[in-house]
C-alpha cells in the first residue's frame, strides 16, 4: 500500500461520495464505508464484507486505512481516583508522533486530545511550545486518538465509553479549526456507534479571535475555554508573546462578549498561576475586571513543573488569596486539579524526548 494514498478516514461523507462517483460507485456506498470506519473501526478494506470484492479492490488501490499505532502507554494513579490517568504515544502514517491522555474520575472518562504536532505559539511555560510546529493533524488523526482512548476505557470497564472530550493536548485547536470541527461532527453524529453530545466537548484556545467568531456563528454546541494567564496586555505578551500580540486583550474581551451573547453559553477562562509573575492581588483585580465584561467562569491551574523550564508553582496560601478575591468579586471560580503529572501528562507537559521521530 502506498503511503502517498489518502487516508480514507480524512474524507467527509460528501467528499467520499464524490470520490466514489469518480470510481463509478453510487453515493450510498459512502455511508456504508463510513459505518465500517467509524462504527466498526475497520482497519482494512477486506473487513468491509458488505462491499463487493471489486469495490474493496478499487478502494485499496485508491485509498489507505491507517489506524494510529500505539507505541507507548504510561499510567499513574491519583490519590482520589480508583482508575489511573493514562497517556499514550501514537504513531501516525508519516511516522510523526502525538500524545493523548485519558483522565478517569468517579463519574467521567475524559479524552484529552491533540490538534497539532507541536505548536507554533511558543509559550515559554509550555513543553509543547518548545518542540516547535510540524503540522496540523487531519480529522482522521483526531478521531483516531478518540477511538484509541475509548479502547482503553472498554478494556478496563467493559460496556463503558468516553464521557467527555477536551481539545487541550498538543497544539492550538483554533489554528486547525476546519479539521477540528470535522472531527467533532463525526464524533457527535448519531449515524455512528460512538456518539457524544457536543455539549460534552470542550475546545481550548489561546484566543484566536477570527476563529472564536467563526465558532460563535457555527451553531455548534461545544464549550469554549480560553487560556488567558494574565489580564494585563504587557504581562500577557511576556507569557504568550505570539498569541497576545496577534490577539490583544481588548479585542479578545470584545470577541468573548459577542460569543457569549450569540451562543448563550459561558466561556471558561483558564488562568495558570506562576510564582512571582501573575499571582499578585493586582493581577487578581485585573482578572476580575476583564472577566466581568462577559459570561464566564474561571479555572485556576497550578503550574506543573517541566524539565529545563524555570517557572514555579505558587504557594497554596497565595492561590487561596487569589481565588478568594475573585469569589468576593462575584465570579465563579474553581481550582482545576492536574492529573498525570508524574508521567508528564498534565497541562503543558505534553512533549518529551520520545516525541522525536525514530532514527
From Swiss-Prot:
Subcellular location: Cytoplasm
Catalytic residues in the record: 99, 347
GO CC term, one of those recorded: cytoplasm
Domain of life: Bacteria
InterPro entries named in the record: Aldolase_TIM, Methyltransferase_A, RlmN_N, RNA_MTrfase_RlmN, rRNA_lsu_MTrfase_RlmN/Cfr, rSAM
Chief location bin: cytoplasm
Pfam family, one: Radical_SAM
UniProt-annotated binding residues for S-adenosyl-L-methionine: 171-172, 204, 227-229, 304
Cofactor: [4Fe-4S] cluster
Keyword Methyltransferase (UniProt): yes
One annotated GO molecular function: rRNA (adenine(2503)-C2-)-methyltransferase activity
GO biological process, one term: rRNA base methylation
Other comment: Reaction proceeds by a ping-pong mechanism involving intermediate methylation of a conserved cysteine residue.
Main function: Specifically methylates position 2 of adenine 2503 in 23S rRNA and position 2 of adenine 37 in tRNAs.
Family recorded in the similarity comment: Belongs to the radical SAM superfamily. RlmN family.
The protein's name: Probable dual-specificity RNA methyltransferase RlmN
Phylogenetic placement of the source organism: Bacteria, Pseudomonadati, Chlorobiota, Chlorobiia, Chlorobiales
Amino acid at each position: 500500500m502506498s503511503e502517498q494514498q489518502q487516508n480514507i478516514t480524512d474524507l467527509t461523507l460528501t467528499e467520499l461520495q464524490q470520490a466514489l462517483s469518480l470510481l463509478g460507485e453510487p453515493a450510498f456506498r459512502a455511508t456504508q464505508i463510513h459505518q465500517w470506519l467509524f462504527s466498526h473501526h475497520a482497519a482494512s478494506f477486506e473487513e468491509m464484507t458488505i462491499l463487493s470484492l471489486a469495490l474493496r479492490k478499487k478502494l485499496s488501490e485508491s485509498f489507505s486505512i491507517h489506524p494510529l499505532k500505539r507505541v507507548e502507554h504510561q499510567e499513574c494513579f491519583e490519590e482520589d481516583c480508583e482508575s489511573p490517568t493514562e497517556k499514550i504515544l501514537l504513531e501516525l502514517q508519516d511516522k510523526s508522533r502525538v500524545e493523548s491522555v485519558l483522565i478517569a474520575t468517579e463519574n467521567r472518562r475524559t479524552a484529552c486530545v491533540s490538534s497539532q504536532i507541536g505548536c507554533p505559539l511558543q509559550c515559554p511555560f509550555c513543553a509543547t511550545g518548545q518542540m516547535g510546529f510540524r503540522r496540523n493533524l487531519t480529522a482522521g488523526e483526531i478521531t483516531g486518538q478518540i477511538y484509541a482512548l475509548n479502547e482503553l476505557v472498554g478494556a478496563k470497564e467493559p460496556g463503558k465509553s468516553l464521557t467527555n472530550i477536551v481539545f487541550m493536548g498538543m497544539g492550538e485547536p483554533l489554528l486547525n479549526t476546519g479539521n477540528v470541527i470535522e472531527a467533532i461532527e463525526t464524533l457527535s453524529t448519531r449515524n455512528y456507534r460512538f456518539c457524544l453530545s457536543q455539549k460534552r466537548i470542550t475546545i481550548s484556545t489561546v484566543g484566536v479571535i477570527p476563529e472564536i467568531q467563526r465558532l460563535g456563528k457555527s451553531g455548534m454546541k461545544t464549550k469554549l475555554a480560553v487560556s488567558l494567564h494574565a489580564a494585563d496586555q504587557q504581562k500577557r505578551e511576556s507569557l504568550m508573546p505570539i498569541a497576545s500580540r496577534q490577539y490583544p486583550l481588548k479585542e479578545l474581551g470584545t470577541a468573548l462578549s459577542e460569543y457569549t451573547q450569540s451562543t448563550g453559553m459561558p466561556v471558561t477562562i483558564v488562568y495558570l498561576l506562576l510564582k512571582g509573575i501573575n499571582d499578585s492581588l493586582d493581577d487578581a483585580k485585573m482578572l476580575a475586571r476583564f472577566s466581568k465584561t462577559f459570561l464566564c467562569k474561571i479555572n485556576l491551574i497550578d503550574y506543573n513543573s517541566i524539565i529545563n523550564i524555570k517557572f514555579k508553582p505558587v504557594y497554596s496560601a497565595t492561590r487561596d488569596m487569589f481565588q478568594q478575591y475573585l469569589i468576593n468579586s462575584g465570579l465563579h471560580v474553581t481550582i482545576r486539579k492536574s492529573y498525570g503529572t508524574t508521567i508528564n501528562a498534565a497541562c503543558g507537559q505534553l512533549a518529551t524526548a520520545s516525541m522525536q521521530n525514530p532514527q
